[in-house]
Structure formats: structure tokens, C-alpha cells
């Protein structure tokens, strides 16, 4: 099918890129005031001590490896996540890079994954790929469930956002291994590296990666291309080895001893189906999510047209059911391990994947309708479409309506909750001086700590933070010196005790 004109979709795609880039400016500016907290200190103590004593990158990496070994035996098996957590940017005084790292990881992995699907497999036009990618990223960044743990607190984001991004890269590489002949050796090597990283990361991402590996093999055999599954065998074996090393770490048993109430396997699975509906449908699907869906529809329609009759879309209900099962499975590890549905950092990656599954199901259902409509066209002798749907007057009116709806929804949410959108929250913190005040308090704290390091004091009193910006503040030390956060900070700075005192 040839398309005569697609200027409008190109302009819209360019506008979305501009909007996304501009929306990040306040986010990165407020991120410059970021400061380590809680587990940032505990997991990076060895690395920080090594850097302060030697200023050697190699010795710092060795410190991170020592942390991996200690935690693997004593607390948790997620070795690849621990390695990253042990190298938090605050070691080098660059904690302000955290939002660049996290948003960059989400953006690059999403772009690579959607480019693989839309350009390499479906053969959609670049403007369609860019438009869909920007809509996804805009909604992901602005409406993340827990923005602090997603983009600003390194320890939480490194454990979930970075493995999620690695898993997207891994999925895209596996698809390219199956569909393209070029660069197979390079892609296989990179897929194996990423498979090890994902297998050694958080259990939510690792479990879904295992499900997708099995699904891919099953689909290949179903379409009688089982011989291609050997291309995925090596990455899967690397993933499996890493996952087993992760799951059977002695530290996991130590940590489980602290979990008093834990449901069994079957109850955890059943609860997962319940919580999937509660969170994905009831809590997260709001007016902003509806706006995301409405804005996607014209781009998805063009993707469906690009694929044309090369796919039959025979089982929309099966795809819907599969999506529900996979998203439900993402709730299971936390329920089984702790008896709790999980925290914001876990919700973040479930939220990101739910958006991808919404895109998949919308695409599949629209494809099913397209094939039915195509058959009807043939029967009635109607002419084939010859231009992008964005050039049609009715679609332009539809997009104008979506834009007005978006402005209304944005204004409503900003009025009711200024922290709902990440950019608005960042602007609020910058304009009110809240971010600068937080930065002044953390700078004062850092000065006191560095002076204590230079003077060799064994104990030090640190004023507790009084300014708590929504995006920047995760937690603080407690009064006295006995809380685990105080002990982590003391270990990080090689002190016998850090006392939190009222300012």
C-alpha cells in the first residue's frame, strides 16, 4: 500500500519529540539537587571507602564486587543489581546524574525495542515509530507511579528501572536474532551479556524474562519454525544460570527469616490476579491513562496498515488473556517473598509494562478489525486507502479533540495535585525555592561529614533534613544513632556513629 502524503504525522511526531525534550529540562535541573539516602550508603560503603583511599576506579570496582559477595551470602542473591547499587554516583559527588541515567535508560531501551517492532518487523514509517515512542515516554516519565524511586533515588531505581531497561534491550536483540541475518554474532554476544544481567537482577524482571523466553520458543514451534529456537538457546542458558545463582543464594534464606507472614505458592498466584486488576485497571487507569490511549489510536492504525495482510490477528482474546497473566505474574514474587504486594519501585516497572501491553492489545484488536474491514471493502468494491489517516479531516478533528481533552486533564491534575506530573512537580520545587533549600541543607551536611572525615572524629552529629521535596526526598537518618540508616551512613564515612539531631 502506497501512501501519498504523511506530512501531518511527521509534524505531530516532531512536535512530540520537542515536547518530550522540553519537559525533561526542569526534571534534570531539579535532579541536580539530588542527594544519597538510606540504602545508597549501605550498598556503596566499600566502593566509597575504596575511592576515598585510593582514587582508583579499579579499586572502587573491587569494592563493588566485595559488596556483591557479602550481600549474596548475607542478604540477597540479586548480584547484578547489587553491583550497580554499589556504584552509586554519589561516590564521585555526582548524584545529580541519577535522573539522566534512569530516564536515559528508559528512553533508549524503549526506543530500541519499539524501533525493532515497528520499523524492523512491521515496516511502519519513521514518523509512526517516533510518535508512538514519544507518547509512551511522555506518559511514562510524567505519570510514573513512584517518581522518586523511579528517577531520583538511585538505589531503588538501579534495582528495578535499569534491569527493566536491560530486559527491553534483550527482547529486541532476540527479535532481531530471529528476523535478521546481519550481525548475528554481535547480537548473540550482547544478548548473552544482557541475559546474565537480567537473570541476576530483581525477581520481577527475571520472572517475566523467563516467561517471555518460554513464550518465544512455544510460538516458534507453533508456527513450525522450531529450528529457529536454537538462536535463543544460548541466551536462555546464560539467563538460566544467572537466575539459579540468584535464586539459590544463601542470603535469600537469611532475608526470608525476617518475613513472618508469607502466603504459599498458590495463594500468591491467586492474589496476583486480584492485585493486577486492582492496580492496573482500578488505580492506575485514570483520565491521564485514557488520554494516552486516545492519542495512540491514529499511530496504531497506521502501524496496522503498514503490516497489512501479512498477519491474520486470529486470537485477540488469547492475546488479552496472555497479557493479563503476564502482568499478574509481576505481582507474584513480592507476594510470595514478603506477603506484601510491593512498593513503588516494583509498581514502576509493572506500570511501564502495562503500557506496553495496552499498546499490544490495542494494536492487535485494531488489526483484527482492519482485516474484517478489509474483507468488507473487497466485497463492496470500495477503493483502497491511499494516504495517511492523519491527512483526513475527521482524524484531524479527532486529534484536536484529544489535544483539548489533554489540556483540560493536565490543568485539572495540576490544580488538584501539583506532584502528579513529574515536570510540574519539578517546576514547583524550583520556583518555590524548595529544591534550593533542600540542596543547601544537604550541602551543609556534606561539609560537616567531610570535615569529620578529615579530622578523624569517631562520632558526629548531623542535623536532620527539614525540607522534603516530593521528587528529591526519599528518607533521612533518625534521631540518635541506632537506626539502620544512621549505621549505614556511619559505615559509608568510616565513623563509629552518626547521630541525627533536630535542626
Where are these predicted regions, by residue range?
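Membrane-interface micro-motifs in multi-pass membrane enzymes
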Residues: 39, 125-175, 202, 329-363
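Transmembrane-helix motifs of polytopic, lipid-linked glycan transferases
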Residues: 101-126, 130-131, 136, 169
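Start-transfer (signal-anchor) and selected internal transmembrane alpha helices
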Residues: 1-25
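Short hydrophobic alpha-helices at membrane interfaces in multi-pass membrane enzymes
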Residues: 176-197
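Transmembrane alpha-helical segments
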Residues: 106-117, 166-178, 211-218, 293-300, ...
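Signature aromatic-anchored transmembrane alpha helix within multi-pass, membrane-resident enzymes
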Residues: 307, 314-320, 368-417
Amino acid at each position: 500500500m502506497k501512501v501519498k502524503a504523511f506530512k501531518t504525522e511527521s509534524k505531530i511526531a516532531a512536535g512530540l519529540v520537542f515536547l518530550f525534550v522540553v519537559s525533561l529540562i526542569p526534571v534534570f535541573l531539579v535532579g541536580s539537587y539530588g542527594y544519597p539516602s538510606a540504602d545508597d550508603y549501605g550498598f556503596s560503603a566499600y566502593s566509597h571507602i575504596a575511592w576515598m583511599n585510593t582514587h582508583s576506579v579499579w579499586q572502587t570496582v573491587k569494592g563493588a564486587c566485595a559488596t556483591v559477595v557479602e550481600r549474596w551470602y548475607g542478604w540477597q542473591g540479586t548480584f547484578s543489581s547489587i553491583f550497580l547499587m554499589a556504584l552509586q554516583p554519589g561516590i564521585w559527588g555526582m548524584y545529580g546524574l541519577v535522573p539522566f541515567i534512569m530516564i536515559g535508560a528508559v528512553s533508549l531501551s524503549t526506543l530500541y525495542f519499539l524501533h525493532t517492532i515497528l520499523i524492523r518487523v512491521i515496516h511502519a514509517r519513521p514518523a509512526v515509530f517516533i510518535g508512538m515512542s514519544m507518547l509512551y515516554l511522555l506518559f511514562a516519565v510524567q505519570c510514573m507511579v513512584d517518581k522518586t524511586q523511579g528517577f531520583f533515588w538511585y538505589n531503588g531505581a538501579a534495582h528495578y528501572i535499569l534491569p527493566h531497561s536491560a530486559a527491553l534491550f534483550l527482547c529486541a536483540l532476540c527479535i532481531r536474532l530471529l528476523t535478521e541475518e546481519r550481525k548475528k554474532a554481535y547480537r548473540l554476544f550482547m544478548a548473552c551479556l544482557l541475559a546474565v544481567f537480567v537473570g541476576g537482577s530483581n525477581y520481577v524482571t527475571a520472572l517475566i524474562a523467563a516467561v517471555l523466553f518460554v513464550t518465544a520458543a512455544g510460538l516458534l514451534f507453533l508456527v513450525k519454525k522450531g529450528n529457529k529456537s536454537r538462536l535463543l538457546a544460548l541466551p536462555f542458558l546464560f539467563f538460566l544460570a544467572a537466575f539459579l545463582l540468584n535464586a539459590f543464594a544463601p542470603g535469600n534464606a537469611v532475608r526470608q527469616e525476617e518475613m513472618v507472614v508469607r502466603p504459599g505458592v498458590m495463594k500468591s498466584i491467586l492474589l496476583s490476579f486480584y492485585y493486577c486488576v486492582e492496580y492496573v485497571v482500578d488505580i492506575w487507569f485514570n483520565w491521564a491513562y485514557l488520554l494516552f490511549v486516545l492519542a495512540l489510536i491514529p499511530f496504531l492504525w497506521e502501524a496496522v496498515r503498514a503490516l497489512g495482510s501479512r498477519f491474520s490477528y486470529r486470537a485477540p482474546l488469547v492475546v488479552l488473556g496472555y497479557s493479563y497473566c503476564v502482568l499478574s505474574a509481576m505481582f507474584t514474587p513480592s507476594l510470595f517473598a514478603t506477603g506484601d504486594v510491593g512498593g513503588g519501585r516494583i509498581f514502576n516497572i509493572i506500570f511501564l509494562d502495562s503500557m506496553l501491553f495496552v499498546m499490544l492489545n490495542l494494536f492487535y484488536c485494531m488489526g483484527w478489525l482492519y482485516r474484517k474491514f478489509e474483507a468488507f471493502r473487497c466485497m463492496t468494491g470500495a477503493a483502497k486507502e491511499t494516504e495517511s489517516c492523519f491527512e483526513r479531516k475527521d482524524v484531524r478533528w479527532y486529534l484536536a479533540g484529544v489535544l483539548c481533552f489533554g489540556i483540560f486533564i493536565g490543568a485539572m491534575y495540576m490544580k488538584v495535585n501539583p506532584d502528579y506530573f513529574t515536570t510540574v512537580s519539578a517546576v514547583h520545587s524550583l520556583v518555590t525555592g524548595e529544591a534550593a533549600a533542600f540542596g543547601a541543607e544537604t550541602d551543609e551536611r556534606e561539609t560537616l561529614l567531610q570535615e569529620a572525615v578529615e579530622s578523624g572524629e569517631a562520632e558526629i552529629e548531623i542535623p536532620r533534613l527539614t525540607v522534603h521535596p516530593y521528587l528529591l526526598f526519599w528518607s533521612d537518618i533518625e534521631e540518635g544513632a541506632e537506626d539502620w540508616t544512621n549505621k549505614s551512613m556511619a559505615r559509608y564515612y568510616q565513623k563509629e556513629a552518626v547521630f541525627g539531631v533536630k535542626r
